Amino acid sequence: MKTITTDWELIPYSEAWSRQTEWFDALVHAKQNGESYENRIIFCEHPHVYTLGRSGKENNMLLGEEQLKTIGATLYHIDRGGDITYHGPGQLVCYPILNLEEFGLGLKEYVHLLEEAVIRVCASYGVVAGRLEKATGVWLEGDTSRARKICAIGVRSSHYVTMHGLALNVNTDLRYFSYIHPCGFIDKGVTSLQQELGHSIDMAEVKERLGRELLAALLSK
């Protein structure tokens, strides 16, 4: 089956979640019934929003409802793995809706593939990134006291079909992370390509590079 890349650009989180769920359910149904389907890789950005995963703790959100309103943000409890994270303008969000069995992937291998694609994109900008033991996502200087996350990953899988995905900080306003314990960590920082390089990055270029890396990784399986 073919894999289609789609760009939703700036889209409210609730709308993106609804569309994702619709396509996810359709792929699961098609797979179970032997029907044709399309794998999708979706790119987008969101207005300021926080999402709390299934294993997340409420106290990792440091603001109350009224305080969230004052910073123009909302909070959603969602059905992915992981704890709390932030999405906002300048952050590249990627939602792959894929049949993992088609690519010979298990869930752990799939998360590793997402991490590797982001690591390669960072390297293409001269930013050395890697993994942190017992923590998903992509990190800089992960084995030091200066460890900081540049990409969060949280997925949902059912019948080896995926939704949700990754969030890469490109030109993100990092102040919004100060209102949470990102991914449940209280002793780790966050960063962005802009923060590391000292200048803004062309978002369209990052999308192109990440899309290329993801497709290459999937097709190599």
Curated annotation (Swiss-Prot):
Reaction(s) this enzyme catalyzes, per UniProt: octanoyl-[ACP] + L-lysyl-[protein] = N(6)-octanoyl-L-lysyl-[protein] + holo-[ACP] + H(+)
Family per similarity comment: Belongs to the LipB family.
Site feature Lowers pKa of active site Cys, where: 149
Localization annotation: Cytoplasm
Keywords from the UniProt entry: Acyltransferase, Cytoplasm, Transferase
Functional summary from the UniProt entry: Catalyzes the transfer of endogenously produced octanoic acid from octanoyl-acyl-carrier-protein onto the lipoyl domains of lipoate-dependent enzymes. Lipoyl-ACP can also act as a substrate although octanoyl-ACP is likely to be the physiological substrate.
Residue numbers binding substrate: 80-87, 152-154, 165-167
SUPFAM superfamilies: Class II aaRS and biotin synthetases (SSF55681)
Residues in the signal sequence: none
Pathway(s) the chain acts in: Protein modification; protein lipoylation via endogenous pathway; protein N(6)-(lipoyl)lysine from octanoyl-[acyl-carrier-protein]: step 1/2
Miscellaneous: In the reaction, the free carboxyl group of octanoic acid is attached via an amide linkage to the epsilon-amino group of a specific lysine residue of lipoyl domains of lipoate-dependent enzymes.
Domain of life of the organism encoding this protein: Bacteria
UniProt name for this protein: Octanoyltransferase
Record keyword Lipoprotein present: no
GO biological process, one term: protein modification process
Top class in the EC scheme: transferase
Any one GO molecular function term: lipoyl(octanoyl) transferase activity
Active site per the UniProt annotation: 183
Domain BPL/LPL catalytic: 35-221
